[in-house]
């Protein structure tokens, strides 16, 4: 399934994988998965985390390695994000719930994920998604950005 991914997508997923793989050992454990999900405002139970891992854990060793992660991401992309998932994701970024993602809100979420971005990088991300040029990202722009991936 991962064969259908572009090199750019694989590089992005590699970056995402290393955000999850806190200790850099090449595997994502339930603990690491939980940490990242909680930093995104989710609160998965231990059982839910186990389920997520065993769903893609091809060699049944209890962790996710990069090839397994790629398969998971390829599968998720095929299911393309449901309206509901996109609304949830937007809420994670839109901290003050005003219907817009500001540069500060984007920086806050990325920092929680352990991603240290320069102001320039954050501004660049906003610029890429900001179609109407008001300096922030509304829900429409967010959906367009997520579906363009």
From Swiss-Prot:
**Location of N-acetylalanine modifications:** 2
- Pfam families recorded for this chain? EF-hand_7
Q: What does this protein do?
A: Calmodulin mediates the control of a large number of enzymes, ion channels and other proteins by Ca(2+). Among the enzymes to be stimulated by the calmodulin-Ca(2+) complex are a number of protein kinases and phosphatases.
Kindly list the positions annotated as binding Ca(2+) 2: 57, 59, 61, 63, 68
Note the CDD domains from the entry: EFh (cd00051)
GO function terms (MF aspect): calcium ion binding; enzyme regulator activity
What is the protein's name according to its record?
Calmodulin
Q: Where does Ca(2+) 1 bind?
A: 21, 23, 25, 27, 32
In this chain, Ca(2+) 3 is annotated as bound at 94, 96, 98, 105
| One of the record's GO cellular component terms | cytoplasm
Record carries keyword Calcium: yes
Family listed? Belongs to the calmodulin family.
Phylogenetic lineage:
Eukaryota, Viridiplantae, Streptophyta, Embryophyta, Tracheophyta
Q: Does the keyword Oxidoreductase apply?
A: no
Where along this sequence does the record place binding of Ca(2+) 4?
Answer: 130, 132, 134, 136, 141
Which SUPFAM superfamilies does the UniProt record give? EF-hand
| Record's miscellaneous remark | This protein has four functional calcium-binding sites.
Residues in EF-hand domain copies: 8-43, 44-79, 81-116, 117-149
Coiled-coil region(s): none
Source organism of this protein record: Solanum lycopersicum (Tomato)
Instruction: Tell me which PROSITE patterns the record gives.
Output: EF_HAND_1, EF_HAND_2
